[in-house]
């Protein structure tokens, strides 16, 4: 299951579809690409509920779709990483889909925006702290509905029992520190974590698909999926 980024309010763009196809080919898996309702029209919890409903549908229909329930993972980039992590949390909480893995690429994890990187990168390219603040204002304009951990996974008081995670953070990204903190919190809760702290990159760097670093990191993500599906 893949949930695209875009600040919860931008619909998916072509390069993310291309990467999803690469993950499918490289990891020899089916990728279900979810088109959730975006926060410009429907704030939290609607985008999250759409993603969780899609996950439930795939789980329920796995036999018809010829999918192995033992090898269902969630993944996403940026805001999509938030949605993936939140789906993993709710699946654990409700005893729903038994996920084998979560792929979190420069994820948004914390609505408090108090980290050092959030203070440092206020005007960085493609994404920065000011845009991040506007994103949260839009996404949570109706509040968190008593489910803060599903809006911002770092607010969960219990991260135990979650599936293994690949967490990727970029050096010059306002989200760097909260992504790394989420990885460390998962690890402290007993979750197996592969943290990739990528030097010399910024949020959304892989938009430039032809760059060697983009190719290398897509390959690392694919390898992480391959390993998760073979365990």
Language-model features: locations:
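Alpha/beta-hydrolase superfamily serine-hydrolase fold, recognizing
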Residues: 2-231
């Amino acid at each position: 299951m893949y949930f695209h980024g875009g600040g919860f309010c931008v619909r998916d763009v072509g390069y993310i579809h291309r990467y999803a196809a690469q993950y499918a080919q490289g990891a020899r898996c089916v990728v279900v690409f979810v088109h959730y309702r975006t926060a410009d029209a429907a704030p939290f919890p609607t985008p999250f509920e759409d993603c969780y409903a899609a996950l439930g549908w795939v789980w329920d229909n796995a036999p018809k779709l010829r999918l192995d329930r033992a090898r269902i993972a969630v993944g996403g980039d940026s805001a999509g990483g938030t949605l993936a992590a939140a789906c993993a949390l709710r699946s654990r909480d409700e005893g729903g889909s038994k996920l084998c893995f979560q792929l979190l690429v420069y994820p948004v994890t914390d609505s408090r925006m108090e980290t050092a990187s959030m203070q440092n990168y206020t005007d960085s390219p493609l994404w920065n702290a000011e845009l991040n603040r506007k994103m949260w204002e839009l996404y949570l304009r109706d509040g968190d509905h008593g489910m803060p951990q599903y809006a911002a996974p770092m607010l969960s008081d219990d991260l135990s029992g979650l599936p293994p995670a690949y967490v990727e953070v970029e050096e010059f990204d306002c989200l760097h520190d909260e992504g790394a903190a989420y990885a460390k919190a998962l690890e402290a809760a007993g979750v197996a974590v592969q943290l990739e702290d990528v030097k010399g990159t910024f949020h959304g760097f892989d938009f430039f698909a032809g760059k060697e670093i983009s190719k290398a990191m897509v390959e690392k993500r694919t390898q992480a999926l391959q390993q998760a599906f073979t365990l």
